[in-house]
């Protein structure tokens, strides 16, 4: 359950930054958001990626353009279904953990539009 461990650590870390985690593993057909949190009035959609070693690339390098497109689609669905509109203040980000899920280095990477 390496992915679940990484997501649990990521959620705890985001909470330590003052965020309220409001959803985990939000799924639609063909897309998923690992964590949805509130940072003040802004909803933040976070993809969590963890790599134990960089032998096959870093955690950040594992996020493909296709994954980003699916993430955007899932974020729009969340806004529409959970809040009835798509124009709320929000942002997307990737939280990477390079190394073991329980002690690897965490990095937060904001995404554009």
Curated annotation (Swiss-Prot):
Q: What is this protein called?
A: UPF0102 protein Dgeo_1894
InterPro entries on file: Restrct_endonuc-II-like, tRNA_endonuc-like_dom_sf, UPF0102_YraN-like
Superkingdom of the source? Bacteria
What does the record give as the organism's lineage? Bacteria, Thermotogati, Deinococcota, Deinococci, Deinococcales
- Pfam families linked to this entry: UPF0102 (PF02021)
Q: Which protein family is named in the record? A: Belongs to the UPF0102 family.
Q: Name one GO molecular function term.
A: nucleic acid binding
């Amino acid at each position: 359950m390496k992915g679940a461990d990484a997501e649990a650590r990521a959620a705890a870390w985001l909470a330590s930054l003052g965020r309220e985690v409001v959803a985990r593993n939000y799924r639609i057909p063909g897309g998923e958001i690992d964590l949805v949190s509130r940072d003040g009035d802004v909803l933040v959609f976070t993809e969590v990626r963890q790599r134990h070693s960089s032998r096959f690339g870093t955690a950040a390098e594992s996020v493909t353009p296709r994954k980003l497109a699916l993430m955007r689609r899932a974020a729009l669905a969340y806004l529409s279904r959970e809040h009835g509109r798509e124009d709320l203040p929000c942002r997307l980000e990737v939280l990477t953990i390079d190394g073991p899920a329980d002690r690897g280095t965490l990095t937060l990477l904001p995404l554009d539009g």
